[in-house]
Amino acid sequence: LGVIRHMCDRVGVLYAGALVEQGTTADILSNPQHPYTVGLLRCIPRGGLHKNTDRLETIPGSPPSLGLHFDGCVFASRCSLADDRCRTEKPEMVTVGPSHVARCFHHDKAPSMARNIEGASQGLSNPNKRPAPAGDLLNINNLSKIFAQDGNKVQVVNDVSLFVKPGETLGLVGESGSGKTTIAKMILGLTSAETTSVMTLSGKKLARALNKRSVEDVGALQIVFQNPDQALNRRHSVTRIVSRAVERLSGFNRTESDNRAHELLSGMRVDASLHNARPAQLSGGLKQRVAISRAFAGSPNLVVCDEPTSALDVSVQATILNLLVDLQKQDDTSYLFISHDLGVVRYISDRIAVLYLGRVMELGNAETVFNGPHHPYTEALVSSVPAIDGSQRVRIRLEGDVPSPANPPTGCVLNPRCPRMAGSGVEGLCTTVEPELKEVEPGHFMRCHIPFDQLRTTQA
């Protein structure tokens, strides 16, 4: 929606195949007049909201199946303003402003309609909950990965060291090709890390390859993929998809596993009437709930969330994020959360690691990383996020493309694109010596030769 704000002149809002509102971009995003549009905009995790203090708003209910016949308004079943007229009579488009129309009998009440903030989910019963360690849950040291490409060695992850505490969310951000997913795959054992890499879970060393790990370790580390269509077996029912994971990770028999699967699905608010459905019969949001249910089949300590909401609309995204937060609070589950959506990462993360060309460039508490002073690369990332309210921030542009890891720049890997190097007084260092990741203030780390106080001054 932020991109739409900056790229489009006019916007049309569709629901259940019907155009429910249309107008200039400024009118639609700043003065919405249809309850559905109002609800969509309220679902967005805007700056300043955080899981520890704020629950995301959602739109109640679920979208109807396409092709259904409606006697009245297509949104009536989910609308807090709906009355008998809305359910029996189809509203026409009415003019609500210059070049602004809405299909609603109560458009004048829409901007001030009651907010919908659902209570916490009922949660998941967890008979096999693992005790949380006293220290770090996950600790990775000198994590590296080298691939062979055309006879050459290409290092795509370079000596990354991170930790995740029990009940904490560590966000991973960075441009495509920065190494986020490769790091996640190495943690999960799907890709073998280099022999110099050391990973421990609850103080116990993790084997680098998945087939060398115990069932206990596999159950303790799970993943929610970006695309549930590819992650769920379309030949199995929803219940069987989850129960197979329960059987493998918990040792239950078929009946016990099916019962546990029903508990997990119900805890994720998948209605019992859908437990025997196939994935193709479910919406994208419901598929992702099934995928999350499966990830929790083995009572994991840490779940890798690899772009888990990128394929979902903002209303479904808000519901999924709320459910993830509920599960985390219930069992102290930790998340490694990968996303290009910085608003989502800021909302759900406790700490954030910013990656570039396989290296951690900045690491710190979520608000510290977003509020600055920033590493120059983080500064550029944050400035590139289009604001939905139309406000204009100074855009810090990175020149050129991300260099190939097969031929990384000498010195700091960001130096050919760095927006702060020129005039910094340390250009010689930047182009010849790779900086170390150093603590610039308590709990805040940067990989940069430019003095921290100088960054603070130039970014003020």
Language-model regions: role of each:
Residues 41, 256-273, 382-383:
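Conserved ABC ATPase "signature" region
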Residues 297-301:
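A short, proline-enriched helix->beta-strand linker immediately N-terminal to the Walker B motif
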Residues 1-54, 308, 312, 316-393:
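P-loop NTP-binding/switch modules centered on Walker-like glycine-rich loops
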Residues 198-216, 369:
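ABC ATPase NBD Q-loop/coupling interface
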Residues 24-136, 366-460:
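Short catalytic/signature loops enriched in Gly
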Residues 278-282, 286:
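Conserved ABC ATPase signature
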